From Swiss-Prot:
Any single Gene Ontology cellular-component annotation: cytoplasm
InterPro entries associated with the record: Arg_biosynth_ArgJ, ArgJ-like_dom_sf, ArgJ_beta_C
Protein name, as recorded: Arginine biosynthesis bifunctional protein ArgJ
Encoding gene per record: argJ
Coarse class of the protein's main subcellular location: cytoplasm
Amino acid sequence: MTTTDSGTGKLVRTQGVTAPLGFRAAGIAAGIKASGKPDLALVFNEGPEYAAAGVFTRNKVKAAPVLWSQQVLTSRRLRAVILNSGGANACTGPEGFQDTHRTAEELARALSNWGTETGAGEIAVCSTGLIGDRLPMDKLIPAVTEIVHEMGGGLSGGTDAAHAIMTTDTVPKEAAFHHRDKWNVGGMAKGAGMLAPSLATMLVVLTTDAAVTAEQLDTALRKATRLTFDRLDVDGSCSTNDTVLLLANGASEVTPSQEELEAAVFAVCDDLAAQLMADAEGVTKRVRVTVTGAANEDEAVTAARAIARDSLVKTALFGSDPNWGRVLAAVGIAPITLDPDRISVSFNGNPVCVNGVGAPGARQVDLSGADIDVLVELNVGDGEAMIRTTDLSHGYVEENSAYSS
């Protein structure tokens, strides 16, 4: 699927942060990665407005670039975002924060020399990769000037940037929504491991040419994040570097309603979250766990997350085993209201458990396909929620045992 039409616009997966008007981007190899692959990305807002919003990891151990970006976003204004892969710059002490500050200052200087007067306080910095090592500033600083001159105004610059933020990702992740009223939202994401509730181990940059305020962006982003990235839970691990940013420049001169803005931002975030799930480390099954009939939405999220994180459930799904007993066992230890005799479970629309007991033919349900929908009906209220997750495969174990963090 590369294009999806709706009544209000079109969602496209072959475009990203440069799909909206007035944004440039680039991705280059700075030499941070030993492989020589692209590892530095830049997203630049040409204006005329520079409204911005962001959400960050809830991990108490925050990387230097997270602390920096949280600080600069208090102004609710950003001209640029610079992102590196190949090093998280987390748990690196005061020196790591100084490296982040220096990166922003060097980019501000390069942009100003390029012809756009920019201050370091208008630049967000994001990093991803191994925790505990400082970045090779002798390679990074010269590359900051180089990437400014590599910025393109076309779609290819956005794709280059999406490639440059990849770590264990196997494919770049982009999405754009083109509203029928001639305004747009674009985005790129990275993340393949440590996918968990506080946004997943992800860097996400979203852009829009809508004429909206930073307050409107903040509301739209928080609503979208709560229903998409916050409900992506592959392995229960929460990163030190999670960052989602949304920039707006008003270049379209169109002011959508708040509802229209929220719908478009959600559409892009939801598609990016689906792409993150599909490219999770070692994934062989894309799984959606939906809980209905919970006492309230919060309890539905708790129940769905308990199932999504359960190793026995995940290994059963890896083996295409319709083991509904493991689902009941997982939900049974969740701190929620439930009646065991009212729980029903379905796999891909096939009932396997009704009112707490097995349904006829439950063991014969075919789960050999790549997509599995798990529906759990608690029947104690009207709360519902969906969590995206994956199976637990040999590939996941092998990849994470070989990848230092």
